[in-house]
Amino acid sequence: MDFLLRNEDDFSAFDRMKFEAMRFTMSKLPRAARRKLLHSRPAQYEMTACYAGKTELVHEKIVAKGFEQYAIPIRGQCDILITGIPDISPYNVYSILNPLLVQVMALGYHFNFYRNKPLLKKGGVLILHHPCFDEFDHQFHPSYIEFFNRLLPETRDAFTLREKYEREFANNPSYIEMYRRGNAYHGAHPFFMWYWGENGRQHIGRVIAAGAENAHVPAILGWERADNLTEAIAMARSYMGNSAEITMLHQPMIGIADME
């Protein structure tokens, strides 16, 4: 799968054959099998820097090295931002990218990968491409299930959620036991995933989930749904105008928009 590390524009004819063969094979496998296959493939990470010393000084060096590696100069914000959501995050290793994690990848990570100004103009449209399946891991993310099905239908307001429910989840004895003796994330963890997306929610005018396999998951998250990317772009243009500027954010590979 090393060819996936290359930009699609640089694919050779053989790379494209391998890509189409892989896509066909994946389409025939059950979702759990696809996930297991992709999660078993080790990433080709290498060390880019190593510093030691006082925390603040080391932090400064590491941040500078990070921007050197990830920053991509961009000129001009867009009206419509398109991004795919990969089936990987820090919180679903060997597990499921559930709806709350899709949310944090889109509105938390991908939106916030910028320096100076966001890629997307204030009030613009974010199109994310993901099936948005209603699937949770009961072993790793038990409190996410209650948060999604019980709390979000009541309110998506981060401040209300924090004041009304965060302590209840943090002190829930079942979640505490699963956190201490099992493999579950802390009972309050879904709240912080929701807070992480708040900057994006406050900035973005509309979110459209292209390719979502159901209507209720996007609706609970406060998003609209489109059958495919073509339909999503048409919807976005109806809001932003036919002359709207469109940017495609390709993640991964990881990039930070260094906005001029």
Q: Predicted segment positions?
A:
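Non-catalytic terminal/interface segments that mediate subunit docking, oligomerization
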Residues: 81-83, 90, 103-104
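Structural motif
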Residues: 79-84, 127, 247-248
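A short, acidic, amphipathic alpha-helical segment used as a generic capping/interface helix at domain edges
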Residues: 56-74, 107-116, 182-201, 227-239
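Short, basic, glycine/proline-bearing loop/turn elements
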Residues: 54-55, 92-103, 217-221
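Extended hydrophobic packing segments that form well-structured cores
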Residues: 194-260
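Conserved, well-structured core segments that form the ligand-binding/active-site neighborhood
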Residues: 1-77, 84-87, 108-112, 118-120
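C-terminal catalytic subdomain
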Residues: 95, 102-206
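Flexible loop/turn segments at secondary-structure boundaries
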Residues: 88-92, 134-138, 215-218, 254-257
